[in-house]
């Protein structure tokens, strides 16, 4: 077990303050279920303030859209359980499909629109005349929790993305440097494959962090364009290095050595890259000129080996330019964090960058179908057995399907959620039967909540 550190303790206390603030305002306004506001404040909490802010607006809009669909759907279909189930499955599935396709904070708009409709719609089918009041109350409670969490995490000791993002940028450049060095020095294929996988993971983590940069509370948000440009340059290193590796393998086939000048320029490039932050643009220009001089002229009489050599030189120029751009952008980001303005040409090029992310329609469709099947099975059991709490089960099926849809294998996450839910039953029983009946003021309620919302020892595997 590992005790929480200072940052984790501060994050936990900020989450507690935002939740208690939402709970107090809910009681003051007279909302019917204040616990929704408190729960929402914890659900939207993120360690970095930029992540909370980036998702807040989309969560609000998604909640409103889901509630509006519920108000439209339930009064018209509540008398036909099968049609009502089919309509809800279609809505949740469509929203989840769009959410999985959209790999930006905007995906939360579609996700919230999906499971908010299920969260409000299923419990309202028994009395559809109250669906508008229920939807309005849920929107107010959830919106209050989102606003309170956003305010507290943005104002009280906000934690910027800059330290985490710059560490990830430096790690990506360092891992790229290692892969390039191993490729140019002719390391074994197993080592190069391992280097490539490490860099691919770095690019993924960098993508997840960089989406929140424009919403950050530090100077990092002014470098959003440079961060996106550097992320694209690091991503471009992957095909560039792979292409160099392929050409070198082809040229060295049948135990043929590389020409001495080519081996020398490969060593020079490797030395320049290993210099790290000390690598200069002037050296890159010299290396590019040397590579250009070594490029053979290709005509109809050229051999296949000459064509391979010319292709290798072209890929080396691309590699030099891309790595040099990474270093230049990293220097600009460092200057931007210190408050210096970014250079206009590079900033404009970054702002005009429109990189397209891969959209996995198969994964999105599979997630939507899984959610539809889960909701349909639960609703069939609910309708067939006239289960009094079937609405809660159908609602939770929709929520779990949406929460874990982005994972390749959501089963471990859902099972872990179930295990910790079972573990929480004794503590919940203690509060429900022993502590809550003795509380007669909001102050005592806040103190009682502090006991189970404060930071606690955690397993190292979860850190």
Task: Please report, for each region that a protein language model flagged, where it lies by residue.
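A transmembrane helix-and-boundary motif of multi-pass membrane transporters/channels
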Residues: 1-215, 222, 332-335, 339-342, ...
């Amino acid at each position: 077990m590992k005790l929480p550190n200072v940052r984790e303790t501060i994050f936990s206390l900020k989450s507690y303050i935002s939740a208690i603030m939402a709970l107090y305002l809910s009681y003051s306004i007279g909302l019917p279920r204040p616990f929704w506001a408190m729960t929402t404040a914890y659900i939207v909490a993120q360690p970095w303030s930029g992540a909370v802010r980036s998702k807040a607006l989309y969560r609000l809009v998604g909640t409103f859209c889901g509630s509006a669909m519920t108000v439209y759907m339930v009064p018209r279909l509540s008398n036909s359980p099968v049609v009502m189930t089919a309509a809800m499955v279609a809505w949740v599935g469509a929203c989840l499909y769009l959410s999985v396709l959209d790999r930006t904070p905007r995906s939360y708009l579609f996700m919230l629109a999906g499971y908010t409709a299920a969260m409000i719609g299923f419990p309202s089918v028994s009395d559809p005349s109250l669906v508008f009041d229920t939807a309005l109350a849920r929107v107010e409670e959830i919106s209050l929790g989102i606003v309170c969490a956003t305010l507290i995490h943005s104002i009280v000791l906000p934690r910027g993305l800059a330290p985490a993002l710059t560490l990830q940028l430096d790690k990506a450049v360092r891992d790229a440097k290692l892969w390039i060095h191993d490729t140019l020095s002719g390391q074994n294929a197993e080592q190069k494959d391992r280097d490539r996988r490490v860099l691919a993971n770095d690019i993924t983590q960098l993508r997840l962090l960089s989406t929140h940069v424009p919403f950050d509370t530090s100077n990092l948000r002014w470098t959003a364009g440079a961060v996106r440009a550097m992320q694209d340059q690091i991503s471009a290193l992957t095909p560039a290095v792979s292409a160099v590796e392929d050409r070198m393998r082809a040229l060295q086939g049948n135990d043929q050595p590389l020409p001495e000048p080519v081996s020398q320029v490969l060593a020079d490039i490797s030395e320049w890259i290993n210099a790290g932050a000390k690598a200069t643009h002037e050296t890159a220009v010299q290396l590019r000129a040397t590579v250009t001089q070594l490029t053979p002229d290709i005509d109809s009489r050229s051999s296949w080996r000459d064509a391979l050599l010319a292709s290798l030189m072209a890929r080396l120029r691309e590699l030099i330019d891309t790595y040099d751009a990474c270093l230049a952008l990293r220097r600009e980001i460092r200057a931007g964090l210190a408050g210096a303005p970014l250079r206009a040409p590079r900033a404009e090029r970054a702002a005009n960058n429109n990189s397209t992310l891969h959209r996995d329609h198969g994964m999105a469709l599979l997630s939507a179908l899984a959610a539809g099947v889960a909701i349909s099975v639960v609703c069939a059991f609910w309708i067939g057995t006239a289960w009094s709490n079937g609405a809660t089960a159908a609602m939770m099926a929709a929520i779990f399907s949406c929460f874990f849809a982005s994972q390749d294998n959501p089963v471990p996450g859902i099972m872990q959620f179930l295990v910790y839910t079972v573990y929480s039953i004794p503590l919940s029983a203690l509060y429900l039967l022993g502590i809550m009946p003795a509380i007669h003021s909001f102050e005592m309620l806040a103190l009682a909540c502090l006991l189970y919302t404060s930071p606690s020892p955690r397993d190292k595997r979860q850190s």
